[in-house]
Amino acid sequence: MSVAGLITEEQLDRAMRLVGRGRALLGIVGQPGSGKSTLSAALLAALDERGVRTALVGMDGFHIAHRALTELGLVEIKGAPSTFDVAGYVALLRRLRDPAEELVWAPEFRREIEDAIQSAVPVRADVQLVITEGNYLLVDGPWRPIRDLLDEVWYADVPEDLRRQRLAARHEFYGRTPEQAWERTLGSDERNARTVAATRGLADLVVTL
C-alpha cells in the first residue's frame, strides 16, 4: 500500500473541502508516538495526487534550543509545553494564514541533532493547504490562539501500548539504552501524553491509525 493509501476517501474529501476558500491551515494533533507524522505524510501524498499544492510545517520547529534548555535546567523535560517558543509558532501561523507574502520560511526540527534548523521549509504564495502537526495544538493558555488560526484540527489516535512501544523504539534509535528509552517514555513523555489526551474531545475529527 502506498503512503497515500493510508487515507480514506472520506478523510481526503474532507481535506479537499478546505481547499478553494483561500489558503487553508489544517492541524494534525496527537500524543507523542501517535503517528502524527505518518498521517501528515499520507495526507500530503493523497492531496498531491489530486493536484493540491501543500506544505508541511511542524510545531517541533519551535523547540527552544537544546543548549538553552540545558542552561535553564529544562532539558530533562524537553517536549513539555514549557519547552517551546509558543509565541514564535503563533506568529508563523499568522503569517501563513495570509498568503500575501511571496515566500515564508519555517523552521524544521531535526532529531539527529536534537535541535531546529531555521528557515528550512519554504512555503510559497501558491500553496493552497498548509498542514501543521504537533502535540499541543488544542491546549489552552498561551497555546489557545493556535486553534483560532486553524480551519480544522484532526486528532491522530492509536492504542496506548502501541504508542508507547513506538516511542521507546524511537528513543533507542536515537541513542538511548532500552532502560533509558522506557524511563523517558513512561516519565516526561507520559505526562505530556496525558496533557494531549485531555484535548481529544476538542478535535474536529479523530483519525484512528
Task: Give the ranges of each region predicted by the language model.
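The Walker A (P-loop) glycine that initiates the GxxxxGKT/S ATP-binding motif of P-loop NTPases
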Residues: G30
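Conserved lysine of the Walker
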Residues: K36
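Conserved nucleotide-sensing/catalytic segment adjacent to the nucleotide-binding pocket
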Residues: A55, I64-I113
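Walker A (P-loop) phosphate-binding loop of P-loop NTPases
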Residues: G33
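Hydrophobic positions on the alpha1 helix immediately C-terminal to the Walker A/P-loop
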Residues: L39
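Small-molecule kinase domains that catalyze NTP-dependent phosphoryl transfer to phosphate-bearing small molecules
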Residues: Q118-S119, P142-W143, E172-L209
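ATP-dependent NMP and nucleoside kinases share a basic, alpha-helical "lid"
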Residues: I113-R170
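Extreme N-terminal, non-catalytic leader segments
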Residues: M1-G27
